[in-house]
């Protein structure tokens, strides 16, 4: 599997843009590099406005809800059972009730009924509602919704799961059906927008008090945290400690919430989901809907208990299935007739993480998929839809139901689908080399402005390398700690790892407060022996001395020169080099090569230049730090023979130094 894990160093920005970000955001070059790669160019980009999105059908749905309010119609809110669906359901049930609606929730039983609107439940829905409103589901329930409409029940579908070729009957509000919409709200996000549109129609202020519920759903569903989602999550995270909803407030207090998205992802959302996974989603929904503090406190305790049981079931299922997973198979398709359907999604994720293969699990007639590019989970299911009772989901995750007697045919079908694609690869994207220890406090503070971290806005990873020192085990041998170049590295759940003489670490910069002192450490995300490192702006650079490279070029070896290197192109044309595209060239000229014997060549070849680049830099100004960062990357790429990085770093070096060649150089 390690051959499908690729480390890549992110490219350096054009110098003018890099400096503009440094100036606009008042940060050093290290943080500016991270901001630039996320599209943050100005302070306003870090705080996008939270506005009403122009979703297709949104205003029509709000008008239908207003009519239902005025006529006293019974509204049934049919939500999904996961954290996104439950928070979205709570938003609309609470929000509509506050406006005087006759509204009640309905959540299907995860284990007995599964995902979506069931035909067997349609008679009950007909009896209980005049308006049927879905949250985080419904986009694939054509027959069920048509039955409701034909029997006089109005239907509004709010969803964000991958739609089919045609939308279902009824009034549909779905981000994917809005042309040119870049934003990706989740089920809870769409529910929040619908309530907002209704408030606007009624002349009321935006219902921002519901942003905390929507933020929990957005984070739980691993939505990209940029643009509108970023604005929503920032607003919601700030509101959680003093939430208007006592259940959410007490749950946050119980798990030690301090305002970070990661705490929602790994503490709050799993407890909400645990109730659903074990068939008791109504307890999580009651927690989000109750206004009674005593009831809320008891329900928080129940969610803790359910989460502990979920962890036990998960570990047992993983121990059973992981040995059956063949990491060489194009897809891992496993049946566990006695397995617990409620935890198989997490188990599938952990098997995917261990094998880097798409995983399809079936337990008691229920199924789950976890996948990674280039294989789409929902498209894989679509290739076998004639074998399924129902299905739905996204590229990365999906769910389905099936007759287990058809499992062999299903397995063959999805394996054939997966075989059409190249092997998935996990990329470890590294921002840069870890800065000098003296800069870590400032870099940490400046990077904190990137929060909330999450999908689409990952916490920056740094590269740290060298000979590990002072290695020791922690936590009864479960974890590993050691030092690299004076920086403490913590590798969680890696206690059995035998460190090589030299190691490369991809890690997160963290701040550790202890006894009144602050220390800056690296939390290892991945470790390995020194290997190839991808990155840079070209696939070829100087794997040999420049003079030798030029001599080989004169003998006819193919050369690539970037179009934005006119001096190099002119030199190559005059020298008669055979110019080729980068993927075909054996040599890549990453710097203007004239004059061959000038100071420029020293950077590539000379001992004097290497000593100059490795000398301790003077870091009094942001510009000095910018030069030091470029020098450090250049020296690293050259000495460790990473051609792509070296070619890019050479261009950056010339740009930040603007070296003047000696007069009279050839």
From Swiss-Prot:
Its cofactor is Mg(2+); Mn(2+); Co(2+). Disulfide bonds: none annotated. It is an enzyme of class 3 (hydrolase). Mn(2+) 1 binds at residues 80, 82, 136. It comes from the Bacteria. Requires a divalent cation; Mg(2+) > Mn(2+) > Co(2+). Structures with 1 Mg(2+), or 1 or 2 Mn(2+) were determined; the authors conclude 2 metal ions are required for activity. Mn(2+) 2 binds at residues 84, 136, 160, 221. Transmembrane segments: none annotated. GO terms for molecular function: DNA binding; exonuclease activity; metal ion binding. Its EC number is 3.1.-.-. The keyword Oxidoreductase does not apply. Signal peptide: none annotated. The keyword Chaperone does not apply. Keywords: DNA-binding, Exonuclease, Hydrolase, Manganese, Metal-binding, Nuclease. Belongs to the RecJ family. Single-stranded-DNA-specific exonuclease acting in a 5' to 3' direction; has no detectable activity on ssRNA. Monomer. Intact protein binds ss- but not dsDNA. This is Single-stranded-DNA-specific exonuclease RecJ. It comes from Thermus thermophilus (strain ATCC 27634 / DSM 579 / HB8).
